[in-house]
């Protein structure tokens, strides 16, 4: 997906109000799966290894692992929700 397509999809989601609904749904699913707790523990562990904690370096270390920790069913469900929205928007 190109940056322009991604930007266009996001704009349509925001304009329709679906972005907020999707965001809330994802947050709830992540919370229920324990993802926030896992990422928090990961960030704390990484921060304890650094003499001076800088957000940019912490994000650089934790973000790829945090993305990997998202359950596959949440990823699939999210993509299906976006695809469903796009099908309706393109009709």
Swiss-Prot record:
One of its GO terms (biological process) is transcription elongation by RNA polymerase II. Pfam families: EnY2 (PF10163). Its main location: nucleus. One of its GO terms (cellular component) is transcription export complex 2. GO terms for molecular function: chromatin binding; transcription coactivator activity. Keywords: Activator, Chromatin regulator, Cytoplasm, mRNA transport, Nucleus, Protein transport, Transcription, Transcription regulation, Translocation, Transport. Disulfide bonds: none annotated. It is found in: Nucleus, Nucleoplasm; Cytoplasm, P-body. It comes from the Eukaryota. InterPro entries: TF_ENY2, TF_EnY2_sf. Belongs to the ENY2 family. Involved in mRNA export coupled transcription activation by association with both the TREX-2 and the SAGA complexes. At the promoters, SAGA is required for recruitment of the basal transcription machinery. It influences RNA polymerase II transcriptional activity through different activities such as TBP interaction and promoter selectivity, interaction with transcription activators, and chromatin modification through histone acetylation and deubiquitination. Component of the nuclear pore complex (NPC)-associated TREX-2 complex (transcription and export complex 2), composed of at least SUS1, SAC3, THP1, SEM1, and CDC31. TREX-2 contains 2 SUS1 chains. The TREX-2 complex interacts with the nucleoporin NUP1. Component of the 1.8 MDa SAGA transcription coactivator-HAT complex. SAGA is built of 5 distinct domains with specialized functions. Within the SAGA complex, SUS1, SGF11, SGF73 and UBP8 form an additional subcomplex of SAGA called the DUB module (deubiquitination module). Interacts directly with THP1, SAC3, SGF11, and with the RNA polymerase II. HAMAP family: ENY2_Sus1. This is Transcription and mRNA export factor SUS1. It comes from Yarrowia lipolytica (strain CLIB 122 / E 150). The gene is SUS1.
């Amino acid at each position: 997906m190109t940056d322009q397509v991604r930007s266009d999809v996001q704009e349509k989601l925001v304009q329709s109000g679906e972005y907020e609904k999707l965001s809330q749904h994802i947050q709830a699913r992540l919370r229920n799966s324990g993802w926030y707790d896992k990422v928090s523990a990961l960030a704390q562990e990484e921060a304890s290894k650094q003499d001076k904690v800088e957000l940019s370096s912490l994000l650089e270390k934790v973000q790829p692992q945090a993305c990997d920790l998202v359950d596959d069913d949440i990823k699939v469900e999210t993509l299906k929700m976006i695809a469903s929205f796009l099908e309706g928007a393109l009709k």
